[in-house]
Amino acid sequence: MDNWLALFDGQTRYFLDINDSSVKPDVLRFRGSEALSEPFRWDIEFTSPQADIPPEQVLMKYATFRMRGGKNVHGMVTRLEWLSTSQDQSHYRLTLSSRLALLGYTRQCAVFQNQSVPEVVEQVLRKHGLEGADFEFRLERTYPPREIITQWRETDLQFIRRILSEVGIYWRTEMDDTRELDTYIFADSQLNYQFDVRLPYSEPSGLFDGAAESVWDVRTWHNIATGTVATRDYNYRTAATPMDATVSVRSDAVTTGEHYRYAAPYRDAGDDASPEPETESGAFYARLHHERELNRSARIHLFSNAAHLTPGQVLEPQGDVITALEEGVVLTLVTYRGARDSRLHVSVWGMPYTERYCFRPAEIPRPEIHGTLPARTESREKNDIYAHLDEQGRYRVRLDFDRSDSEPGYGYLWLRMAKPYAGDTLGWHTPLIDGTEVAIAYSNGDIDLPYIAYALHDSEHPDLVNRDNHTRHILRTPANNKLRMEDKRGEEHIKLATEYGKTQLNTGHLVDAQGQRRGQGAELRTDEWGTIRAGKGLFVSADAQAKAQGEALDRDAALKEIDRLNQQLQQLEMAAEQALALKADVDSQIEMFEQRLKPLNEVVLFSAPEGMALTSGEHLQMTATKNVAINAGGDISAGVMGNMTALAGEKLGLFARTGQLSVKSGEGAVEVQAQNASLRLFAEKKLTLSSASDISFAGKKRITLIGGGSYLRLEAGKVEYGTTATYIRKVKRTMFAGANSTPTPSISIPLVDDLIRNGFFDEQFRILDDSGKPMANVPYFISSENGETFKGVTDNQGLCKRVFSKESAKLTVWLGVLALERW
């Protein structure tokens, strides 16, 4: 239409109005470029009688470029160039740009979390002052929120173009003539093309095209396209789930081969058999990339003089057209060229329209980070003494470049930490607490695939090893759990310690907190309780094993000593047997030696070549369910300052093979009783009883003295003596008196109850009052769950008689009247 009007009126066909400016441009010539998913740019040359136009009069001003045929371009002046000045006028060139072009002047490093691509784009647009009427999302798909979207050293324009290209969303520009602003439509399907754009296809005749709007001079390019796109990715969150997808979009293009894309960023494989796979799945990205390949399989170029042609339209050339134009042409790039003295030239690029696939912007690669970025681990509580982890052991961090005011503990996504060793609930993980400096690395440089590479010390968190202790290797936790290894020659040591109870294992050259020597060898200590437990057996030895050479369980020295003493004990046993003394149970000791000590079978064996001592500030107790054996190749000495007691449930034997058996009391009496049997004294030689005072013999029934065939019997008030030889009595005087007798001294022999019965379970109760004192003479009745009963009264110590049972059973006790009722 502009060309048609120019034939008659000779007036200016192009106008440039700059808002809020005194500059009145007269358009000389122009060149414009508009494309899908790109900001438009119009370079306009103009003349003005005003010389030296101040830049502030033009730059960052809204402006409108109008054609008399009806096309209006609203934008922002972003560039002004002075070309020349004559006597009458000055010659300038300015650039009229899309408002989106202004996003190219803001470069950011930013992190967006848990937002979808459209949400992030909208946030960026609104940050630059664009409102709801300035843009519109016409999307057929629902886009899921991403865990993270990173903007890295990109302008805001580069950033939104990149993330939109990743998901195949394109955008086109429309002009709002009412508000005189450019607006933007974001779309993801063919449904949002502009249809019903028709122009006749007419090749120009000669140098004149008749000024009628048309298209002409079609050119086409056809290329072989990839036949199949296959994708694969790895998602550590579902490590065992296959992440493969293969897609081939039906088309008329000639295709061959396969494009395999590994590490395409997606979380789920998706259904690659579906024509509409789940958004942002592996199948979605495979289809998207194949659509891009098909976009390049056929290209169309046309010339036109129609000013209203714009990217995003589906142009339907009318008339006798080639096959490539029959379904229409999706306009992807339109350039305009015109001047004050020449007609409008429009150059159109596009691709054949098809319902099988849509225009997709070329994929813009993500920026890559092939190093690390500084960050700090972050907890929800400042200075948290414990690591802030999720159920997978991942961390939150705050990147040093992040300027957002996000809530503590939510500044970045959950991150895995690289470790020197990992496996199924096994590995090496030393948790990092709030404020620890870490280096964030990126898998294959992908800015949206971060992980913690390692931790570092800094000025606020100094290294625990430095020039002052450079010979040490230290692992220390915040609670001062510590593994320290000293490599200083001649002072090597290892310390494993925890603050709880000051529990430590120290080996080698032992030092104190100041590094001063306090011992050598090995030390295991704690302020709390200690346990050494070995289920198969424990060998504790002071036998030397130089330079750690030899078997760990080398017990030859200890076993030889035990075997030698057992042989000596066997000889003593034989002598005791010949002397009719009580035999020692040597067989059980030999059995233990063979079955327990030699194989170290569930026993504890102590060995020391030069001596062993056990000491206690209070009590020292040795107990055994069966036997206690003490053997010595020399002497056994037992000394006590109080009482010494030897109690035997059955027999007690003392046998001295070659020396004397001596029993002496320095102050108290010596008392020997056979409470329920005989008492025998025998000597192969002379038997002597002597006293510095009196000797009394008392027998309740009789006393009989026998010697050399003669006897003396005292019985039932009679004195009887007899001999087979001479009876000699040598006395100075003999006195006779009346009958008399001396009573036999009464000796009380207590009844000793059984305390232990082999093969029986036993229990004994003590009855105490509220003050804790024993209660004597209290009737009691005890019943077991297997029917056995026991009754009696408590003694002076409040004790009931010990009860025995062959089976373990629950006991019930009644006291006092309740007990008497059951008697």
Stretches with model-predicted labels:
Residues 1-823:
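Amphipathic alpha-helical and helix-coil boundary elements used as assembly
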